[in-house]
Swiss-Prot record:
This is Thymidine kinase. PROSITE patterns: TK_CELLULAR_TYPE (PS00603). Keywords: ATP-binding, Disulfide bond, DNA synthesis, Kinase, Metal-binding, Nucleotide-binding, Transferase, Zinc. The gene is OPG101. GO terms for molecular function: ATP binding; metal ion binding; thymidine kinase activity. It comes from the Viruses. The active site is at residue 83. Homotetramer. Two molecules of substrate bind to each enzyme tetramer. Substrate binds at residues 113, 157-161.
């Protein structure tokens, strides 16, 4: 085996996916791996780079398709991808990079605000060596939260926002509201 593999970090909004992605990439940096992170360029909530909801910042390339950054990442051995659910080529890209010996770490929502699979992100599960599903805290009853609930009536899937537009909720609070 060439050492390449895929690590998938999934969960609802506010579960710490981006924070965990940054932690893992930093861990490889400490071990002297050449690392790069990629963020979805339409996510400009906090400015350039990769941002967590608690305003931690990490340098990142920006793209709407991962194939657009292939040339820029050839010299890196660890690739971190934030908001993986928004990249239409996430599955093919991750499989190709892992097969080329690269470590690929993806942070992504597993479900939409309607609790449906988010694009093709779940197709990465059988291709991943490691899958972690994080939970958040329900913003209504403070129990474990596995779901993202959108505030408002907008039905479009790709609406990028933070605490102003979404809540993490448990099953009961999702159903009750």
């Amino acid at each position: 085996m060439n050492g390449g593999h895929i690590q998938l970090i999934i969960g609802p909004m506010f579960s710490g996916k981006s924070t965990e992605l940054i932690r893992r990439v930093r861990r490889y940096q400490i071990a002297q791996y050449k690392c790069v992170t990629i963020k979805y360029s339409n996510d400009n909530r906090y400015g350039t780079g990769l941002w967590t909801h608690d305003k931690n910042n990490f340098e990142a390339l920006e793209a709407t398709k991962l194939c657009d950054v292939l040339e820029a990442i050839t010299d890196f051995s660890v690739i971190g991808i934030d908001e993986g659910q928004f990249f239409p080529d996430i599955v093919e890209f991750c499989e190709r990079m892992a097969n080329e010996g690269k470590i690929v770490i993806v942070a992504a929502l597993d479900g939409t605000f309607q609790r449906k699979p988010f694009n093709n992100i779940l197709d990465l599960i059988p291709l991943s060596e490691m899958v972690v599903k994080l939970t958040a805290v329900c913003m209504k009853c403070f129990k474990e939260a596995s779901f993202s609930k959108r505030l408002g009536a907008e039905t479009k899937i790709e609406i990028i926002g933070g605490i102003d537009m979404y809540q993490s909720v448990c099953r009961k609070c999702y159903i009750d509201s």
